[in-house]
A protein has these predicted regions:
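Coil-to-beta-strand transition motifs
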Residues: 188-190, 201-204, 216-218, 230-232, ...
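Acidic, serine/threonine- and glycine-rich low-complexity intrinsically disordered segments
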Residues: 207-283
Length: 398
């Protein structure tokens, strides 16, 4: 009787604690918090006083299935002894500059070229009242990210035994869909990405340049690579779709960078509703942590992760009959406040989850901009994971 009563109480608490009202009101933080030092790589956690409301683990995750994604459920089942999710109060802190909000209110963007392009006011969130599935994808791609992102580009492939391959590089990302960019180079472009490998030594100086247009049908992606072995630059039209880069060791595709990017023509897209889900959010403790502490077996150290109940727009992508992709089915989750992707499940041809991806969001309040602190790709077949696009207070360390 005691066991039954305890179970009933847990289920009741799930419904009482987590409802539509649990998400709360949006209170953006649009300026640096007290004692923030712009010369430091540290970001003060504005929610340091928050307490864990609930720890979800293998013993109780079934009580919260309504708020979990299929990928999260698979993580509990695959790593029952180590994977936990600490649930904190929802703090809807994401913000953008006032100029972006004003442009969004006055915008009249529209999709063109069968969804492969956007025509609208540069600097706005193109589709604040999104109705089409590709509206959410374009909002994610074109959301405000700051002007230029310059810094290190560390990545890690972690094996089940804890051993890892690590690398680093230098990266420059120019965001052309930005109200503060006044550059003739940006005419008709989404932006530009340049990367150079600095570690490991055998790949040092290998470089990549990608230029992305606002209309992939009219002006497809242009990419070049530099091979230090031959000292030659060559065009690289294959760096798109499901191209597997060597650095990811087969764990991630070209169009998975930043969640999703590039041409959309290989999929049929559909809306799958708006739901409340536990998602990685306001992960200041992770950002400020020691790199040695966060890289653990099977998945990142969940002690430093924070999950909140947020509203997400869910989009499905199913490969077209006459196309191919190693991920023939994908489910993407977009934060309703920031429009950024926070999670994705990539399925194989048997409708089994191949990869689960998390893109934990954090408000860089000095900008302000809500960006993913990293991309963590968990591969269930090999039990390895890829941690890349890492932003942290240790950005220059490998």
């Amino acid at each position: 009787f005691f066991i039954l009563l305890t179970t009933l109480n847990i289920c009741a608490n799930a419904e009482i604690l987590f409802t539509e009202n649990s998400v709360g009101d949006r209170i953006p933080i649009s300026s640096p918090v007290e004692n923030y030092n712009p010369n430091s790589n540290q970001y003060i956690n504005p929610f340091i006083e928050d307490k864990i409301q609930l720890e979800i683990n293998i013993t109780n995750y079934e009580n919260y299935l309504a708020y979990l994604t299929e990928g999260q459920i698979k993580m509990f089942q695959s790593y029952p002894e180590t994977f936990v999710m600490n649930i904190y109060p929802s703090r809807r802190s994401c913000a953008v500059p006032q100029e972006v909000m004003d442009l969004t209110k006055s915008g009249n963007s529209k999709m063109i070229a069968n969804g492969e392009g956007v025509d609208g006011i540069v600097g706005s969130i193109p589709f604040p009242n999104a109705t089409e599935p590709l509206h959410h994808v374009w909002n994610h791609i074109l959301r405000y990210r700051g002007v230029d992102i310059i810094g290190g580009a560390p990545y890690y492939v972690v094996n089940p035994d804890g051993s890892m391959t690590q690398g680093a590089g230098e990266a420059i990302a120019k965001n052309c869909w930005n109200p503060f960019v006044k550059d003739s180079f940006c005419e008709g472009l989404q932006g530009m990405l340049m990367q150079k490998v600095t570690h490991p030594p055998r790949l040092a100086d290998a470089s990549l340049l990608v230029i992305e247009s606002l209309n992939a049908l009219e002006s497809p992606r242009k990419a070049w690579v530099y091979d230090p072995g031959t000292r030659r630059v060559r065009r690289a039209p294959n760096i798109a779709y499901d191209y597997l880069g060597s650095a990811s060791q087969g764990l991630s595709t070209a169009d998975s960078f930043d969640g999703f990017n590039g041409a959309k023509d290989r999929y049929n897209w559909s809306n799958a509703g708006t739901e409340l889900k536990f998602m990685p959010y306001n992960v200041y403790d992770f950002y400020n942590s020691d790199r040695k502490e966060i890289l653990t077996n099977f998945h990142v150290n969940q002690k430093y992760m924070r999950y909140e109940l947020i509203k997400v727009n869910i989009v499905r992508a199913d490969v077209k009959n006459d196309k191919r992709h190693i991920y023939p089915h994908r489910v993407m989750y977009f934060d309703a406040d920031s429009h950024g992707m926070v999670s994705e499940e990539a399925y194989n041809g048997k409708k089994e989850i191949l990869n689960y991806r998390e893109l934990p969001l954090m408000n860089f309040y000095d900008e302000p901009a809500c960006l993913a602190v990293h991309s963590a790709t968990y591969n269930f077949a090999t039990r390895r994971y890829l941690l890349n696009n890492v932003r942290s207070s240790e950005i220059d360390k490998i």
